[in-house]
Each structure stands twice: as structure tokens, then as C-alpha cells.
Swiss-Prot record, chain B:
GO terms for biological process: cell division; G2/M transition of mitotic cell cycle; mitotic cell cycle. The modification Phosphoserine is found at S65. Phosphorylation at Ser-65 by gwl during mitosis is essential for interaction with ppp2r2d (PR55-delta) and subsequent inactivation of PP2A. It comes from the Eukaryota. InterPro entries: Endosulphine. The keyword Glycoprotein does not apply. It is found in: Cytoplasm. GO terms for cellular component: cytoplasm. Residues 1-27, 77-115 are annotated as: Disordered. This is Alpha-endosulfine. GO terms for molecular function: phosphatase inhibitor activity; protein phosphatase 2A binding; protein phosphatase inhibitor activity; protein phosphatase regulator activity. Belongs to the endosulfine family. Protein phosphatase inhibitor that specifically inhibits protein phosphatase 2A (PP2A) during mitosis.
């Protein structure tokens, strides 16, 4: 059961595993673009810029080492999407996997949705551990036998074989998005899911690929009047009629599909009023929400904008109930962050299993955890230096003033190319997956 | 809906918060001044249309069938089409064939995470 969380109260985070190449020369295809645990936490999926999906499976805890949680090892890997070129629109379609979402498990097989900018695919991952042997007309290697040599008949039987994990695309949901898909979210009814692009949100049935319903459309009649785009969307965890979507202007709209077929009219609008004296050129850019996630309870939702994480109570639209500063020291760097485009980086955020702690990434391969109950926060680093097995991670600190204490790092020394955009928290245990540019780190709490 | 009765300590906290907010606002305004000094032509509506348009048009490349056919004709004299050093240049010889347009081929190599 997840403890009080990462605030440093009683949880100590230890290095567990790191996946990926060590060398500094990162091929673009190896850039990790999404990380997601399945509903039981047994499987961990990653997607990359090369359109590939790698799934890790947690090993069962060994009897010899009851104090250790199982390690995650490769279970399956496949090419989900390929690069395409739309000749009619002169558009290059990247194969980068933007999001992976698991379906709740219903039978022996596992299902996940993976999407690039334009196409969503439903993948089935199944195990095969037996195969039929003893055919009458075929040899074991598949060659056909000469029928004249068959003198007796036998019934083929299933024999055990080495485990084989197969991934096959079961559905392809294509041609429904003019703009770039940023989110997919499976509904709690397990029958439908939504996909959101910059201007529209569509509702799909998992069984039907040739039709989808448009439920949100914010495209203005005159594109010159465009002032905001959709940045993320998610279904409520247990109310199948409710979903939210966030915008580049820092607002979140909650919609109820029972109200009307087209949910352009929101049911609730969550927006924190800004002090007009604080307004600057950067205001809108840094208020753009890069991720929105409901709490497991469904009572709260969390949003991530460039500098902070906000927790909203669904019952209160006027302002967030909690605000956590992720890297406030970047305010004095906004000019250069705009010039090098870092100000447009889209950080994600996640909840722990019991909604007591939230986590998000930052620069210099730092990531932050905020314990809501104990009001504590901690900065940790994902690096090869602190990757000795079971070594406890040391909290990091960025110094903003003149005097730099020992072990602190100054703002000017931060490496803005080392960004942690994607993190995931195991649904029950204190196990986290943190993606640096091309490596996947797995940390666990000290047992 | 929320109650506005603040205790003394809460008032102090609010004051402090306001101070730090002012400080933050000044920091940010300072950055804005720096940016405007570097780029005097920066648009009136920074978060607005231009910017969003750029975002919506990500991935746009221009294919000209005339260029394509011309280059195809030239290709007969060449061994292999040579993609220009600047792959974003879209005129003339720089887009010889559709095969070059998807600049990246799909990864034939297994992900290093699975290695």
C-alpha cells in the first residue's frame, strides 16, 4: 500500500533499474515520448519517436528476496506506427507515439491504444505457450507429407512451448483528425474512448473504426480569430458521461455528454483569475496547460502549466485548491527559454495510487514530488551517477541566490536539454517510471 | 462561496504571498523587456494567432508536382537522388522523388530500451 509518499516524510526513493543506451549520442528515434503503467501495474509501456512500443513486465517477487519488488523486464516490443506522407495536404505525419493508454484487462490478453498525430491503433498483446503438434498431413517443420506415406491417423495435441508474446493490431482508427492528436482517454464504460486534437475531440467505440462522433469543436469559422487550442483531454475515472479538456490559455472545461451531442457548451469552466498587473508577454504561454489528470478518486484534477502544478476540486471552478511551484527560479530565465523554445516544453504530471502525492518532471533530469498531506516536496535526479542498485536517491536543490551551498546547483548550470517530460506512478505501490530523453529509470521506495 | 474571514497569520501569509508575487511579476517583466530589446518586431498578440498557426501547421512540407516531374526527368542521368543539405528547401531539385519526402524511414532497429 502506498505510504505517505515522496515528500521525504518516511519514503526514501531508491534506484531500481535503468533501460536504454548509455551513450550520449541519442538517435532521434530513441527519444521516449510516452510512459504508462497498466491498471494492475504489472505492465509498463513506453512509446518513442521512432513509432515503437516497448512493454516491460514485472517479475513475480522471488521467494529468496521477499524484501525486493520484482524487476521490470522486456515483455514485448513492436512497431506501432510508421512515418507517412499525406500528399494531398503536403503534410508529413510523424510516427512518434504521442500517447499510450491501456484498456482494463478483461481476458487473458492485454489491450492498449497507441496514437501518433493522426491515427489511433488498438493493439492486442497475447501470450502463446502451447502449440498443436502431431498433424497427419504436415511435418513438424510445416512441410507437407506425402499422403501415400500416411498409414495411421492420430489426433493432434497441444504441447507446451517457450512463451511467445505476440502483438497484433486489432483496430485502426484513422482519418478522423485534421489537426494533431494530443490525447486519448479510455472511458470507464470500457466501450468508448475519446481522442483530442488541437481543435476537436472525437468519441469512438472501440469496436467501430469507420465512424466517430465529434463532441467538441472549437474551430472558429474564421481561422484568423483563433485564440486558443485544446492541449489535453481526459475522461472522468468513474463517471462515464464526464470529461475535461484543457486549453493553451490555462482554462479547463468540464463537459457532460448527457447535456447535448456537441459539448461546445461546457458544464464547468475552471480558471484562475490573473492579476492584470502581472500580465506580460509570457503570461499566456506559461499558463498553457500541458497535461490534465483526474485523481483516482475522481474528486480532484491536476493540471500542469510551465511553472506549476495545480490541484482543482471539481466542485470549485474559481481557483485551484492547491498550487505547487515546480521550478519558480525559471521566471528570471523566461527570455532565453523563449529563444531556445524550452518555454513550449510539454511536461506531464501524475498522481500516486492513493492521490496523496503528485509528481512531475523538470530540467537537468530533475523530477519533483509534492506530498499534499504533509505539505512537503522533494527534488530528485534521474542520472547514471546515482544508479547503483538500491542506492537511496539524494534530494537535489537548485540555488537561486548568489551563495551556492555545497551540493546545490545554480540555475545557470542547469542543462535544459535534459528534460523529464514523462513520468508514471504504479497504481498501487511506490514504484515510479521516469523517462529522460532516451532512458527509462525505475525507482522504488526503500522497503 | 468560500469564506473570506482571514485570521492574522493568514493575513500575514497573504501579504507575503503578495510580495513574492510582485517580485515574480517584476522578474517576468524584466525578461519581457530583454526579449523586446532583442526582437523589436515581436507581435502584439504573443500567445495569439501567429503562434497557434505555427503549432497547427507542424509537419507542413510543400510538394510541387512540377518540381517532382522535372527532377524525375533529371534522375535518369543520376545514380541516386541526392537530398540537399537543407532538407527544408522545397523548390527545384531538392525534392526529387516521393521516396525522399518521408525524411525518416521507420525504425528497422529494435528499440534500445529492449536491448
Amino acid at each position: 500500500m502506498a505510504g505517505a509518499g515522496g515528500g521525504g516524510n518516511d519514503v526514501q526513493w531508491c534506484f531500481s533499474q535503468v533501460k536504454g543506451a548509455i551513450d550520449d549520442d541519442v538517435a532521434e528515434a530513441d527519444i521516449i515520448s510516452t510512459v504508462e503503467f497498466n491498471h494492475s501495474g504489472e505492465l509498463l509501456a513506453t512509446g518513442d519517436k521512432g513509432g515503437r512500443v516497448v512493454i516491460f513486465q514485472q517479475e513475480l517477487e522471488s521467494k529468496n528476496q521477499p524484501q525486493c519488488r520484482g524487476e521490470y523486464n522486456v515483455y514485448s516490443t513492436f512497431q506501432s506506427h510508421e512515418p507517412e506522407f499525406d500528399y494531398l495536404k503536403s503534410l508529413e505525419i510523424e510516427e512518434k507515439i504521442n500517447k499510450i493508454r491501456w484498456l482494463p484487462q478483461k481476458n487473458a490478453a492485454q489491450f492498449l491504444l497507441s496514437t501518433n498525430d493522426k491515427t489511433i491503433k488498438l493493439w492486442k498483446i497475447s501470450e502463446r505457450d502451447k502449440r498443436p503438434e502431431g498433424y497427419n498431413l504436415k511435418e513438424e517443420d510445416g512441410r507437407y507429407r506425402d499422403p501415400t506415406t500416411v498409414t495411421t491417423l492420430r489426433v493432434p495435441v497441444f504441447q507446451p512451448m517457450d512463451l511467445m508474446v505476440e502483438a497484433s493490431p486489432r483496430r485502426v482508427f484513422a482519418n478522423a483528425h485534421t489537426y494533431h492528436i494530443n490525447s486519448i482517454s479510455v472511458n470507464s464504460d470500457c466501450e468508448t474512448y475519446l481522442s483530442a486534437d488541437d481543435l476537436r475531440i472525437n468519441l469512438w467505440n472501440l469496436e467501430i473504426t469507420d465512424r466517430s462522433f465529434n463532441i467538441v469543436d472549437i474551430k472558429p469559422v474564421n481561422m484568423e480569430e483563433l485564440t486558443e487550442v485544446i492541449t489535453a483531454a481526459e475522461f472522468h475515472p468513474n463517471q462515464c458521461n464526464t470529461f475535461v479538456y484543457s486549453s493553451s490559455k490555462g482554462t479547463i472545461r468540464l463537459c457532460d455528454m448527457r447535456a447535448s451531442a456537441l459539448c461546445d457548451q461546457h458544464s464547468k469552466l475552471f480558471e484562475e483569475p490573473e492579476d492584470p498587473s502581472n500580465r506580460s508577454f509570457f503570461s499566456e504561454i506559461i499558463s498553457s496547460i500541458s497535461d490534465v489528470k483526474f485523481s483516482h478518486s475522481g474528486r480532484y484534477m491536476m493540471t500542469r502549466d510551465y511553472l506549476s502544478v495545480k490541484i482543482w476540486d471539481l466542485n470549485m471552478e474559481s481557483r485551484p485548491v492547491e498550487t505547487y511551484q515546480v521550478h519558480e527560479y525559471l521566471r528570471s530565465k523566461l527570455c532565453s527559454l523563449y529563444e531556445n523554445d524550452c518555454i513550449f516544453d510539454k511536461f506531464e504530471c501524475c498522481w500516486n495510487g492513493n492521490d496523496s502525492v503528485v509528481m512531475t518532471g523538470s530540467y537537468n533530469n530533475f523530477f519533483r514530488m509534492f506530498d499534499r498531506g504533509y505539505r512537503q516536496d522533494v527534488t530528485l535526479e534521474a542520472s547514471r551517477e546515482s544508479s547503483k542498485p538500491r542506492s537511496v536517491l539524494k534530494p537535489r536543490k537548485v540555488c537561486t541566490g548568489g551563495k551556492r551551498k555545497k551540493d546545490e546547483i545554480s540555475v545557470d548550470s542547469l542543462d535544459f536539454n535534459k528534460k523529464i517530460l514523462h513520468t508514471a506512478w504504479h497504481p498501487q505501490d511506490n514504484i515510479i517510471a521516469v523517462a529522460t530523453t532516451n532512458n527509462l529509470y525505475i525507482f522504488q521506495d526503500k522497503l | 462561496m468560500s469564506s473570506e474571514n482571514l485570521s492574522d497569520t493568514q493575513m500575514e501569509y497573504e501579504d507575503e504571498k503578495q510580495d513574492s508575487q510582485e517580485k515574480n511579476a517584476n522578474l517576468v517583466k524584466g525578461e519581457e523587456v530583454k526579449l523586446k530589446a532583442k526582437y523589436p518586431g515581436l507581435g502584439q498578440k504573443p500567445g495569439g494567432s501567429d503562434f497557434l498557426m505555427k503549432r497547427l501547421q507542424k509537419g507542413q512540407k510543400y510538394f510541387d508536382s512540377g518540381d517532382y516531374n522535372m527532377a524525375k526527368a533529371k534522375m535518369k542521368n543520376k545514380q541516386l537522388p541526392v537530398a540537399g543539405p537543407d532538407k527544408n528547401l522545397v523548390t527545384g531539385d531538392h525534392i526529387p522523388t516521393p521516396q525522399d519526402l518521408p525524411q525518416r524511414r521507420s525504425s528497422l532497429v529494435t528499440s534500445k530500451l529492449a536491448g
